[in-house]
Design a protein with these regions (language model features):
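Short, basic, glycine/proline-bearing loop/turn elements
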Residues: 35, 96-102, 117, 192-199, ...
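Short beta->alpha connector loops
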Residues: 66, 129-131, 228-229, 275-278, ...
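Donor-nucleotide binding loops and adjacent catalytic segments primarily
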Residues: 50-51, 70, 226-329
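Acidic, Mg2+-coordinating phosphoryl-transfer loop and its flanking beta/alpha structural elements
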Residues: 351-353
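Active-site-proximal region of nucleotide-activated glycan assembly enzymes
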Residues: 145-232
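Glycosyltransferase specificity loop/lid
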Residues: 23-136, 142-157, 161-175, 296-342, ...
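N-terminal amphipathic/basic-hydrophobic helices that include classical n-h-c signal peptides
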Residues: 1-24
Length: 375
């Protein structure tokens, strides 16, 4: 029998029954956007994408740690609080070259994920660095899309991973540090992949191998928030997709000084991001204080110690694309909202990346295509 559409409902049907039939046919699908709130980027990217679905067809749910709920601004969908490890814990472990999650944490995440699935009953899950979804979404048989960066793709044709900024590598000559890191990298990638692999085995799932890149990109579909021209790949599977830079603005008003900035001197935009070493910001501002420039800086929510130089204007958050548009030079930590979003490149600004972001090569890979101008 041919199914009825809402326009073909029998005219003689009871009005209440007719309304009920229409509503059942118009039920919306539920999309759950799941952010791991360890850095601003992992919350901002799904927040930017959540505006895309047609709300007449899809019910939108956003899940993240409550500490980041304010970033939702005037989001009209449903919010579900789900805990994440502290950002400081995440960054400290990265800075020491340690796996950011242990097995117990990922197991707890899986239980939290499944509880949320039971409550929300999503038809689709879109996650950003919520590694436990590799297990929980499969257990619940829910299609899972993961937002990632192409430099974490196993198919990225990287000639050699740059040396990360770690305590040991900072003490060694760059040549020696490079040689040692190239020898140790496979072991480091295996070490970071092990906790998720252990959780997968507990639930009877196959190993992803000894490569953290597969742990970071295990999903039914992978969405790379990058441009393929910057990150060439080899034999990219059909379920891996380049979706381009994800542009996001924090839900805050611009500071009072924003519209009063003079255009007589070059503007330098400084942001060390939420995953950089914010304690370095005063030193960067001081280094720029004697130049004939106007400095605008974002602290990404952290407090700023010391006096602000006379040529500097500081706010917790700034609209990155607009700041890049106004700036002649962008000084950043190589974070994914600064470089991988290509905001400065879009507006033809020069970029200087302060090597401050911890990790096992993330910021270095992300900004390897950026020319660092002499200034």
């Amino acid at each position: 029998m041919k199914p009825l559409t809402t326009g073909e409902l029998p005219a003689t049907a009871d009005p209440q029954a007719r309304e009920g039939m229409g509503n059942s046919l118009m039920d919306r699908k539920t999309i759950l956007f799941f952010a791991e709130a360890v850095t601003l980027a992992h919350v901002a990217r799904p927040l930017a994408l959540i505006e895309a679905p047609d709300t007449s067809r899809y019910h939108r749910v956003f899940a993240c740690d409550p500490r980041c709920q304010w970033l939702l601004g005037d989001f009209a969908g449903e919010f579900c609080p789900v805990p994440s490890i502290a950002s400081d814990t995440f960054l400290n472990r990265l800075a020491q070259g340690k796996p950011v999650y242990d097995t117990a944490t990922l197991e707890a995440y899986v239980h939290d994920d499944l509880s949320l699935f039971e409550k929300v009953k999503p038809d689709l899950v879109i996650g950003d660095f919520r590694l436990s979804l590799s297990v929980s979404a499969r257990l619940a048989r829910i299609p899972y899309l993961a937002i990632s960066n192409a430099y974490w793709s196993p198919y990225y044709r990287v000639p050699a991973y740059p040396v990360p900024s770690l305590p040991l590598t900072r003490l060694l000559p760059i040549g020696l540090a490079t040689m040692l890191f190239r020898l140790a990298r496979p072991l480091a990638f295996a070490l970071h992949a092990r906790p998720l692999d252990q959780v997968r085995r507990k639930y009877g799932m196959s190993s992803l191998g000894h490569d953290v890149r597969r742990a970071y990109t295990d999903a039914d579909h992978i969405l790379y928030a990058d441009l393929p021209q910057f990150f060439p790949t080899l034999s990219l599977p059909a379920n891996h997709h380049f979706i381009g830079p994800i542009i996001w603005k924090p839900p805050v008003s611009t500071p009072l000084w924003w519209d009063a900035l003079s255009s007589e001197r070059p503007i330098v935009y400084v942001t060390l991001g939420s995953s950089g070493q914010g304690a370095l910001l005063p030193h960067v501002l001081q280094a720029l204080s004697d130049l004939e420039v106007t400095v605008i800086a974002a602290t990404a929510g952290s407090s700023l110690a010391g006096a602000i130089p006379a040529n500097a204007y500081v706010a917790q958050y700034l609209p990155g694309d607009e700041a890049s548009h106004r700036a002649s030079l962008v000084v950043c930590n190589g974070g994914s909202l600064n470089v991988s979003d290509e905001n400065p490149l879009k507006f033809s600004s020069s970029i200087f990346r302060r090597r401050s972001e911890p990790g096992i090569g993330e910021a270095e890979c992300r900004s390897s295509f950026v020319r660092k101008p002499c200034w």
